[in-house]
Amino acid sequence: MRRPLVVGNWKMNGRSASVARLLNDILAGIGDCKAEVGVCVPFVYIPQASEILKGTKVMLGAQNVADHNSGAFTGEISAGMLREFGCELAIVGHSERRLLYGESNELVASRYEQAIQGHLKPILCVGETLEQREQGRTLAVIGAQIDTVFEFAGVQSLEHAVIAYEPVWAVGTGRSATTGQAQEVHYHIRSLIARWNPEVAQAVQIIYGGSVKPENSAELFAMPDIDGGLIGGASLDARAFLSICHSVSV
């Protein structure tokens, strides 16, 4: 039985005071939440967040991870460095990284591999643009993104990873995929993995990201192949994020 997972991606938001307030509000309201819960904060706030979350049920994550473990790579932060400060999760391949910073499938796969080797759980983001969807290429695009990761790290690595489907046209736009659209792609992703390893396919958590909010989370999470959410804007509001966390069904 796959346990639901809800992860907040704070993106480039927050100041020290607001980080403390938001994390403490989340901890105060998390209670007997049935889902696993995590937050991916900006790099500079990871030490602060680590102190606040230490010993709690909320996992700490980073929003990216380097594709090398050390060396002359200015501005990069390795999996080992993140682990040292208490990180358990790391987002890789977010659509904003792919689109705004030109990260290729190969670079994303290398980051994913480094996360696995550094004992972080990567959240591998995959998804299509609106143009690709309208061209009927959704499944081919996502298949290529996932296959590249398997070439680098193998399908067995998914035993220690999460996949997040985030349709690019729904990220930060207020426009979400319908439950039917999301379930269709999640089912396809699981079927694609099953071609490599059926047991891994049934075990891996596949979560949805793309304008998830309290108004639509329960319906999305009720779908058989949607195991939770990667939450953007709504994760910056403790009440909204907690509502989403508590909307999971098990």
UniProtKB/Swiss-Prot annotation:
GO biological process entries: gluconeogenesis; glyceraldehyde-3-phosphate biosynthetic process; glycerol catabolic process; glycolytic process
Subcellular location(s) of the protein: Cytoplasm
Reaction(s) catalysed by this chain's protein: D-glyceraldehyde 3-phosphate = dihydroxyacetone phosphate
CDD domains cross-referenced by the UniProt entry: TIM
Enzyme class, spelled out: isomerase
Superkingdom of this protein's organism: Bacteria
UniProt entry keywords in alphabetical sequence: Cytoplasm, Gluconeogenesis, Glycolysis, Isomerase
GO CC field: cytosol
Pathway(s) it belongs to: Carbohydrate biosynthesis; gluconeogenesis; Carbohydrate degradation; glycolysis; D-glyceraldehyde 3-phosphate from glycerone phosphate: step 1/1
GO molecular function, one term: triose-phosphate isomerase activity
PROSITE patterns in the record: TIM_1, TIM_2
Functional note: Involved in the gluconeogenesis. Catalyzes stereospecifically the conversion of dihydroxyacetone phosphate (DHAP) to D-glyceraldehyde-3-phosphate (G3P).
Family from the record: Belongs to the triosephosphate isomerase family.
PANTHER family documented for this protein: TRIOSEPHOSPHATE ISOMERASE
Subunit description: Homodimer.
Protein's UniProt name: Triosephosphate isomerase
